[in-house]
Design a protein with these regions (language model features):
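Short hydrophobic beta-strand that contains or immediately precedes a catalytic carboxylate
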Residues: 22
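Flexible "stalk/tail and boundary" regions
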Residues: 1-12, 16-17, 25-81, 85-86, ...
Length: 143
């Protein structure tokens, strides 16, 4: 997968069965199944298989004493979903409940993963996050 595979954002709705259409541009990269888990900032992280494996490997490489909580957070809330013939995935009720995602969502490309946000929360995040804050953060990590 190219690093720029998951970019942009798209508004969608989750149907009454918890299904979400993946945007066509992103669907071509994920294959027939996706891994999802509770993300940071109350979103859902969605990975294709290779991306999920890399994510798990990076978590497991952390010192054990510091990684236990992160491993439980991500693996304990993880789920696997097939991508159906219409390009839909099913988001488990448990993940929707814990992230506050109900109907209207924004699907966000985050380079190596897709993030699924409640649209109101995504809009709020964008309003609160300005370029100077991002610039300061990047300076702190030596970028």
């Amino acid at each position: 997968m190219a690093l720029n595979a998951f970019i942009g954002n798209y508004q969608h709705s989750i149907d009454t069965k918890g299904r979400l259409f993946l945007p066509a541009k992103q669907r071509s990269y994920v294959g027939e199944k996706v891994y999802m888990t509770r993300g940071l900032d109350d979103c859902i992280f969605l990975f294709y298989e290779e991306g999920w494996n890399a994510f798990v490997e990076s978590l497991m490489s952390l010192p054990t004493s510091k990684s236990r909580t992160a491993l439980r957070f991500f693996s304990g809330n993880a789920a696997l979903s097939d991508v159906d013939g219409q390009g839909r995935i099913t988001i488990p009720q448990s993940l929707r409940k814990i992230t506050g995602i109900e109907k209207d969502v924004t699907v966000v490309g985050a380079l190596n993963r897709i993030e699924i946000w409640d649209t109101e929360r995504w809009d709020s995040f964008n309003l609160q996050t300005d370029s100077s804050a991002v610039s300061e953060l990047l300076e702190e990590v030596g970028f």
